[in-house]
Design a protein with these regions (language model features):
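Short helix/loop capping segments that flank catalytic or ligand/cofactor-binding pockets
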Residues: 29-32, 50-51, 143-145
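Conserved FAD/dinucleotide-binding core of flavoprotein oxidoreductases
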Residues: 33-70
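Secondary-structure transition/capping motifs at alpha-helix termini
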Residues: 72-78, 160-165
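Active-site-proximal substrate-binding core of FAD-dependent oxidoreductases
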Residues: 83, 88, 92, 159-176
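A conserved FAD-binding loop/helix module that cradles the flavin
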Residues: 138-159
Length: 176
């Protein structure tokens, strides 16, 4: 992981990328034709620019091949099973879903952007400056990924403001 991070700091993708792989068709086979699967890879430390320049088609293809080779090193025959591949760059993620530089964590996971500094100092308890408007998501503590913790934490603060017990957040939906 550290080598991947070091490569990212130098503005390139890692030759030994750190991957999060998901195969949703293992739990929902209706997402692909019978006997086929869909796999998604999230590559940590993918630079928003390569060597200070925008991604090119050649960069995307080479990056995709690096990721495929990383998987194939641990899963012989993997390459032969691929019918289609699509690479999304950080810039494309920014344009498509508003993630600055493709960062799913909505800010670096560094001390100056964590805990009481997330999303910004003074607004770390899920309340915005507007009464009744709460914040949750990747930009709030504890950060991004798909875990739901920021939403749960914001729900607890809403319950506190409504003077409702926080013992069972599921009941709050019916009250609101």
């Amino acid at each position: 992981m550290e080598r991947a991070y070091d490569d990212w700091k130098m503005g390139t993708w890692s030759r030994d990328p750190f991957l999060d792989m998901m195969i949703p068709t293992l739990t929902d086979p209706t997402m692909a034709p019978p006997g086929k699967h869909f796999m998604s890879c999230f590559v940590q430390y993918c630079p928003p620019k390569v060597g200070g320049k925008n991604w090119t088609k050649e960069n995307k293809d080479a990056f995709g091949e690096t990721v495929i080779q990383q998987i194939a090193d641990y899963s012989p025959g993997f390459k032969d099973k691929i019918l289609h591949m699509e690479v999304r760059t950080p810039k494309e993620l920014e344009e498509e879903v508003g993630l600055t530089e493709g960062n799913i964590f909505q800010g670096e996971l560094t001390f100056d952007q964590l805990l009481f500094n997330r999303p910004i100092p003074g607004y770390a308890q899920y309340r915005s400056p507007i009464k009744g408007l709460y914040m949750c998501g990747s930009s709030t503590h504890p950060g991004g990924g798909v875990m739901g913790a920021p939403g749960r934490n914001a729900a607890v603060e809403i319950l506190k403001d409504l003077n409702l017990p926080e013992s069972d957040i599921r009941d709050a939906y019916e009250v609101l």
